[in-house]
Design a protein with these regions (language model features):
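Surface-exposed loop/turn elements that mediate protein-protein interactions on large endomembrane-trafficking
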Residues: 9-37, 73-93, 119-145, 171-204
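Repeated polar recognition positions within modular binding domains
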Residues: 6-8, 71-73, 98-100, 124, ...
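Short beta-strand elements that form the blades of beta-propeller/WD-repeat-like
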Residues: 1-10, 52-70, 103, 107-119, ...
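Repeated scaffold domains used in trafficking and secretory/extracellular systems
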Residues: 1, 32-60, 94-106, 146-158, ...
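N-terminal hydrophobic targeting segments
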Residues: 111-118, 125-129, 139-152, 157, ...
């Protein structure tokens, strides 16, 4: 994602010319407004109010398409030839910050929040949800209940989705006059795509 004509666009870097171009295949497009297929908008900044809606976060590539999250909560798909841009589904609720991460497998996207409830003193439920990439199906595939916890570092290998559970507590550093988060990874888990079941793979701190 880069700045082009005073807004942000999905860009392609040409290794031969060493230049960037908007990923837009529209005929006669001027690449300077929201009608452009490469249009992203203004990336979110904590220090200013903006009217856009794309997160300053990861760009995902899966099966010849590029995916981004926007601050309206949508997963948005861009074709790599610039011919289309489409909103697939609302996959999370945006509240000013987002730890939302994605893992793609078998035409589904698995969505989790790596911030979760880290540092909270009350018990809460962390989830992994999946959405079909045609936007027609949504379901919660995993729930973890814990205190001050979050699901993190999810990776897809073979027929399993592996992830860690991170827990954190907050403490006050009186000398530095600041609050410190103390976190650790607790056990490795795996979700089986075929059976829909999950369990611990490795016990204890990692």
């Amino acid at each position: 994602i880069g700045k082009w004509n005073n807004a942000f666009f999905l860009l392609f870097f040409d290794k031969d010319t060493k230049e960037c171009y908007p990923v837009c295949g529209k005929a006669d497009c001027t690449h300077d407004n929201m009608e452009c297929n490469a249009y992203v908008g203004y990336q979110y900044s904590k220090n200013r109010q903006t009217t856009t809606y794309y997160l300053d976060s990861a760009v995902y590539y899966y099966k010849d398409n590029v995916y981004l999250l926007d601050t309206n909560g949508y997963l948005v798909r861009f074709s790599t030839d610039g011919s289309t841009r489409e909103k697939i589904a609302v996959v999370y609720a945006y509240g000013g910050e987002s730890g939302t991460n994605l893992v793609f497998h078998d035409d589904y996207v698995y969505v989790y929040n790596l911030l979760g409830h880290l540092g909270n003193e009350e018990e809460a439920v962390e989830t992994i949800k999946r959405y079909s990439l045609d936007g027609k199906k949504e379901e919660t595939v995993l729930e973890y209940t814990g205190t001050g916890a979050a699901i993190t570092r999810a990776k897809s290998y073979g027929e399993r989705l592996y992830f860690l559970i991170e827990t954190a507590t907050m403490s006050k550093d009186e000398k530095a006059n600041k609050v410190i988060m103390n976190s650790r990874y607790n056990s490795l888990y795996a979700y089986d795509y075929k059976t829909g079941t999950a369990g611990k793979v490795l016990e204890g701190s990692i």
